[in-house]
From Swiss-Prot:
Cross-link (Glycyl lysine isopeptide (Lys-Gly) (interchain with G-Cter in NEDD8)): 705
Pfam families hit by this protein: Cullin, Cullin_Nedd8
Organism: Homo sapiens
Listed pathway(s): Protein modification; protein ubiquitination
Protein name stated in the entry: Cullin-4A
PANTHER family linked to this entry: CULLIN
GO biological process, one term: positive regulation of protein catabolic process
GO (cellular component) term, any one: nucleoplasm
Length: 759
């Protein structure tokens, strides 16, 4: 290891010939380590020669050669020397430590040339486009020249310049000189920027311009690092002014769809400018400027002027474009949301609030819901905010008219589930029921729906008018899923009653087969649990002896199996099939029990007065008039009324129509008494209100029993949380007063707004 130090010293001498890529001083020979046997040894390199000395004037002569080549490049003339020879000359100079001088001389040569280029641009006679072309040519020439010069002086660039961080590369030096002596000249810069802005303005006006010229010049400004300060700020300022004026003008002149198309076109054009010739950094502020001036400043005006019309006309592409554009602007979606909600509430209220439109209300609501759903899906990209606000808006307007929408939705379900409905398939019926359930969710007074739905369901079940048992069960399942088992328990009980009645009738018919005198009447009885079914007003009528006898037989049979129960006959729900003989032949009539009692009288005589029929049947006055109307004034006129007329009056006479003709064998005579009258509607609604009072009373007592003492406001708040139907504060106050009167609770003697539970 004693010879390590001399090896280092000799190696530094070798490195001294490495063309300046490494600094020899950094590798100076280290002193020999102590401990050797005598002095340090030297490593001798055979055939080592000292660096040859340059001839006198070599540096000056070589620079003249290089300077001549530089001038040739700058003047675009041929170079007398080949590039390899010039490159080697630069390498030789750098190897002999004249790099600083060489760099300085090269910079001066380039600077002299660039300074000479400014003179032609100071002529005032050039128009803007010619000026831009001239400055672009100058820039292109300068770039080409600097590339060539750099290739000649590449060794200098990669050694001396690279090792000196304070020096710009030859290329950067060229950019700096061009920026300093040409583009930074106030007149040149002003004409260049103004010319570029003029070309862009012309292009925005629809003229064709030289885009490659713009791309080159803006690239020059970017390369020279003056793009943002000298061009972009002024460009954005002019853009802002242009689109501010354009937005104001076009909002006055154009309809909203046309205006939105123009905005989309402008945004596309500006985006294309960024791609084609503007610097990428300009994209964000440029697009933001267009959006602000053409959209942001006019959001409310656009919506007020055009949204309602687009929605009324179902202009789906235009609405999609509006959503897409408004989503680009801060506050745009929120503004669209608010107007969207107002439109839904206004349009929906017009459907719900007008009694003249009650006939078509539910179908109109379903169609409107389909329409807004389609708009949300296709135009608003299923945006959850639009979906949720649509639901809130539907809930708001549909409850502006209490009770009626709930009633009509129940009737609409009835029309779909009744036999003879026009739904083509089970799948279509199922889809319709799903849509109806969506409307049902929006209703606050679901108890009103339940009351009318139950009444109509009873008719369908008792008269056998259901289109499909599966559809009925499906609807029941939907209601149960939506409102819970408590809501549908009575409805499910109605179905159970019908199934149990079928079993009972099977056993009853078997029982009757064993009887010696079963009679001519085939009786079918439905046993209904009173708590499940709607409340029916009982009517005592005079049945025929055969009917009374059969009733007693069934009563004995049923109570024999179910002792302790009580049967109450509901004559208003009875119906029958009657056989009749006419001159033209035999017919069968599907009629109500009241119609049956009237027609059976004509087995005893050919004609009776209104008063005689009333006395014989015991049917209540108004019900009898409707019954006789159906038999004598309808399409199937089994009776002839005298005098003729549509209304049944006191003293009218009725005779049997022996000449009756009809193309069908079995004829169904409209059961007018089963059609809902105004009185029935009022009665159903009143029962709902009565039930609500009971529920309010029960809730108040339940709360007070638990809390013992409670303030008025807290009690009302608790009630709102517990009750599942809308209720007014005044109604709650009345129920509280009623309970105080009935000693369920009492007021505090010192604080009238405080209540105490009375055990």
């Amino acid at each position: 290891m004693a010879d390590e130090a001399p090896r280092k010293g000799s190696f530094s001498a070798l490195v001294g010939r490495t063309n300046g890529l490494t600094k020899p001083a950094a590798l100076a020979a280290a002193p020999a380590k102590p401990g050797g046997a005598g002095g340090s040894k030297k490593l001798v390199i055979k055939n080592f020669r000292d660096r040859p000395r340059l001839p006198d004037n070599y540096t000056q002569d070589t620079w003249r050669k290089l300077h001549e080549a530089v001038r040739a490049v700058q003047s675009s003339t041929s170079i007398r020397y080949n590039l390899e020879e010039l490159y080697q000359a630069v390498e030789n100079l750098c190897s002999h430590k004249v790099s600083p001088m060489l760099y300085k001389q090269l910079r001066q040569a380039c600077e002299d040339h660039v300074q000479a280029q400014i003179l032609p641009f100071r002529e005032d006679s050039l128009d803007s486009v010619l000026f831009l072309k001239k400055i672009n040519t100058c820039w292109q020439d300068h770039c080409r020249q600097m590339i060539m010069i750099r290739s000649i002086f590449l060794f200098l660039d990669r050694t001396y310049v690279l090792q000196n961080s304070t020096l710009p590369s030859i290329w950067d030096m060229g950019l700096e000189l061009f920026r300093t002596h040409i583009i930074s000249d106030k007149m040149v810069q002003s004409k260049t920027i103004d010319g570029i802005l003029l070309l862009i303005e012309r292009e925005r006006s629809g003229e064709a311009v030289d885009r490659s010229l713009l791309r080159s010049l803006l690239g020059m400004l970017s390369d020279l690092q003056v793009y943002k300060d000298s061009f972009e700020l002024k460009f954005l300022e002019e853009t802002n002014c242009l689109y501010a004026a354009e937005g104001q003008r076009l909002m006055q002149e154009r309809e909203v769809p046309e205006y939105l198309n123009h905005v989309s076109k402008r945004l596309e054009e500006e985006g294309d400018r960024v791609i084609t010739y503007l610097d990428h950094s300009t994209q964000k502020p440029l697009i933001a400027c267009v959006e602000k001036q053409l959209l942001g400043e006019h959001l409310t005006a656009i919506l007020q002027k055009g949204l309602d019309h687009l929605l009324d006309e179902n202009r789906v592409p235009d609405l999609a474009q509006m959503y897409q554009l408004f989503s680009r602007v801060r506050g745009g979606q929120q503004a669209l949301l608010q107007h969207w909600s107002e439109y839904i509430k206004t349009f929906g209220t017009a459907i719900v609030i007008n009694p003249e439109k009650d006939k078509d209300m539910v179908q109109d609501l379903l169609d409107f819901k389909d329409k807004v759903d389609h708009v949300i899906e296709v135009c608003f990209q299923k945006n959850e905010r639009f979906v949720n606000l649509m639901k809130e808006s539907f809930e708001t307007f549909i409850n502006k008219r209490p009770n009626k929408p709930a009633e009509l939705i129940a009737k609409h379900v009835d029309s779909k589930l009744r036999a003879g409905n026009k739904e083509a398939t089970d799948e279509e019926l199922e889809r319709t029921l799903d849509k109806i359930m969506i409307l049902f969710r929006f209703i606050h007074g679901k108890d009103v729906f339940e009351a009318f739905y139950k009444k109509d369901l009873a008719k369908r079940l008792l008269v056998g008018k259901s289109a499909s048992v599966d559809a009925e069960k499906s609807m029941l399942s939907k209601l149960k899923h939506e409102c819970g088992a408590a809501f549908t328990s009575k409805l499910e009980g109605m179905f159970k009653d019908m199934e149990l009645s079928k079993d009972i009738m099977v056993h009853f018919k078997q029982h009757m087969q064993n009887q010696s005198d079963s009679g001519p009447i085939d009786l079918t009885v439905n046993i209904l649990t009173m708590g499940y079914w709607p409340t029916y007003t009982p009517m005592e009528v005079h049945l025929t002896p055969e009917m009374i006898k059969l009733q007693e037989v069934f009563k004995a049979f049923y109570l024999g199996k179910h002792s302790g129960r009580k049967l109450q006959w509901q004559t208003t729900l009875g119906h029958a099939v009657l056989k009749a003989e006419f001159k033209e032949g035999k017919k069968e009539f599907q009629v109500s029990l009241f119609q049956t009692l009237v027609l059976l009288m004509f087995n005893e005589g050919d004609g009776f007065s209104f008063e005689e029929i009333k006395m014989a049947t015991g049917i209540e006055d108004s019900e009898l008039r409707r019954t006789l109307q159906s038999l004598a004034c309808g399409k199937a006129r089994v009776l002839i009324k005298s005098p003729k007329g549509k209304e049944v009056e006191d003293g009218d006479k009725f005779i049997f129509n022996g000449e009756f003709k009809h193309k069908l064998f079995r004829i169904k005579i409209n059961q007018i008494q089963m059609k809902e009258t105004v009185e029935e509607q009022v009665s159903t609604t009143e029962r709902v209100f009565q039930d609500r009072q009971y529920q309010i009373d029960a809730a108040i007592v339940r709360i007070m029993k638990m809390r013992k003492t409670l303030g008025h406001n807290l009690l009302v708040s608790e009630l709102y949380n517990q009750l599942k139907f809308p209720v007014k504060p005044g109604d709650l106050k009345k129920r509280i007063e009623s309970l105080i009167d009935r000693d369920y609770m009492e007021r505090d003697k010192d604080n009238p707004n405080q209540y105490h539970y009375v055990a």
